[in-house]
UniProtKB/Swiss-Prot annotation:
Gene3D superfamilies documented for this protein: Ribosomal protein S10 domain (3.30.70.600)
Function, in words: Involved in the binding of tRNA to the ribosomes.
GO-annotated molecular function: structural constituent of ribosome; tRNA binding
Cited InterPro entries: Ribosomal_uS10, Ribosomal_uS10_CS, Ribosomal_uS10_dom, Ribosomal_uS10_dom_sf
Species whose genome carries this gene: Campylobacter fetus subsp. fetus (strain 82-40)
Any one Gene Ontology cellular component term annotated for this protein: ribosome
Subunit annotation: Part of the 30S ribosomal subunit.
Keywords for the protein's UniProt record, in alphabetical order: Ribonucleoprotein, Ribosomal protein
Lineage: Bacteria, Pseudomonadati, Campylobacterota, Epsilonproteobacteria, Campylobacterales
Family to which this protein belongs: Belongs to the universal ribosomal protein uS10 family.
Entry protein name: Small ribosomal subunit protein uS10
Biological process annotations from GO: translation
Length: 103
């Protein structure tokens, strides 16, 4: 396996950064090289709802949801690297997308 790309997404950036630090530490212990973490643009989803169920259209509330993302590239991954990644206990709030890349 030549290269592994990890894309991590979470609503809380602190949990995301702790997870990224744990992954980087585990990968470096196996001797593989890590590129990143690269902070990706934060996606903001905004929702506007009426405060009143009947009248007063001018009275509204706005909510937003921020999705933070990081990207890691693991270069020269070994079977030990893949093994250590699968054994990691990651936070359930973090969405991890793993993709094996060629050269």
């Amino acid at each position: 396996m030549e290269r592994i790309r990890l894309k991590l997404k979470a609503y809380d950036h602190r949990v995301l950064d702790r997870t990224v630090a744990a992954i980087v530490e585990a990968v470096k212990r196996t001797g593989a090289d890590v590129r990143g973490p690269v902070p990706m643009p934060t996606k903001i989803k905004r929702y506007t709802v009426l405060k009143s169920p009947h009248v007063n259209k001018d009275s509204r509330e706005q909510f937003e949801m921020r999705i933070h993302a990081r990207m890691l590239d693991i270069v020269a991954a070994t079977p030990d690297t893949v093994d250590s990644l699968t054994k990691l206990d990651l936070a359930p709030e973090v969405n991890v997308e793993v993709r094996a890349m060629g050269k």
